[in-house]
Regions:
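Formylglycine-dependent sulfatase
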Residues: 2-5, 10, 19-283
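Single conserved hydrophobic/aromatic residue that forms the stacking wall/gate
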Residues: 281-294
């Protein structure tokens, strides 16, 4: 299954929900999560012995897990692909740019009466071209990598909160702030259908310790990456816990995938063999770069 088919899948669920449950008070809520630079070899649900992802494993066990999900080998094409449901042949413009005039899945949800939010990595707007979260159909946003924010995505994060850039203090961790924002959005909209799009900044480099790392000063890239994957799993768990607490879990579709494979600077266990990651800043297309979780 490719990333654009993921879009088609959950839009089909939306349309089915609209027609079948039109007379009912509840439509399905949707939480769509896209992790950043992590291949399927990094998940214990896929058999990894190096990584621990218990919350995602539980999602896979309770729902569906796909063995063959393939992304594009670079992040922007995957993001454009996912948000429009179209092959990049038809609408890819350039790295870090979303094509103006292309409708996104957020617009389809808004047309069905959904509240919409995006929180995480944007990277679809430059000072010259692209679109903002609002232009993409999101009512609310808390995003990094948009004109006005600085380069800090983890500690001391620089994030745009609903149009205002906030440079957080050194004790703040970006992924925690973003998860907090989405949880607040869910709580605010608990009585109406909502779409929460969560393009995570984890576990993209720089590979630094997380708030849950045993060694807060670690310089070991692989060790820190493993911790970042664990924190990614923790953030997903926090979102699900909020849904459970609010009594919304059974009425919420959660989808988790990734934009591309693991960073090529890392050597990891690839189901019995040691291989470098293959996030394709090179042209060597391989399963390590294209195979992602779903």
């Amino acid at each position: 299954m490719s990333i654009n088919k993921v879009t088609i899948l959950f839009l089909a669920v939306l349309l089915q929900t609209a027609s079948v449950i039109q007379a009912e008070s509840k439509k399905l809520n949707v939480v769509l999560i896209m992790a950043d630079d992590v291949g399927y070899e990094c998940f214990s649900a896929y058999g990894s012995k190096e990584f621990s992802t218990p919350r995602l494993d539980a999602l896979a066990a309770k729902g569906m897990r796909f063995d063959h999900c393939h992304s594009t080998p670079l992040c922007t094409p995957s993001r454009v692909n996912l948000m429009t449901g179209k092959s990049n042949v038809f609408n890819y413009v350039d790295f870090g740019v979303f094509p103006k005039g292309e409708p996104t899945f957020a617009y389809h949800f808004k047309a069905q009466g959904y509240a919409t939010a995006v929180a995480g990595k944007w990277q679809l707007l430059t000072t010259q071209t692209g679109i903002s979260p609002k232009e993409a159909g999101f009512d609310r946003h808390c995003v990094w990598n948009i004109p006005g924010t600085e380069r800090r995505r983890y500690w001391k994060p620089s994030l745009m909160h609903d149009g205002k850039v906030i440079n957080h203090g050194e004790e703040k961790y970006g992924s925690t702030v973003i998860a907090d924002y989405l949880i607040d959005f869910i709580k605010t909209n608990k009585d109406k259908p909502f779409l929460a799009y969560y393009p995570m900044n984890l576990p993209h480099n720089p590979f630094d310790p997380t708030p849950r790392s045993k060694d807060p000063k670690s310089k070991n890239a692989k060790r820190n990456f493993i911790d970042m994957v664990a924190y990614m799993d923790h953030c997903v768990g926090r979102i699900e816990d909020a849904l459970i607490e609010l009594g919304l879990r059974e009425n919420t579709l959660m989808i988790f995938t990734a934009d591309n494979g693991t960073n090529s600077s890392l050597t990891l266990d690839f189901f019995g063999t040691q291989r470098r990651g293959c996030l394709l800043y090179t042209s060597d297309a391989a399963d390590e770069g294209l195979g992602v979780d779903l």
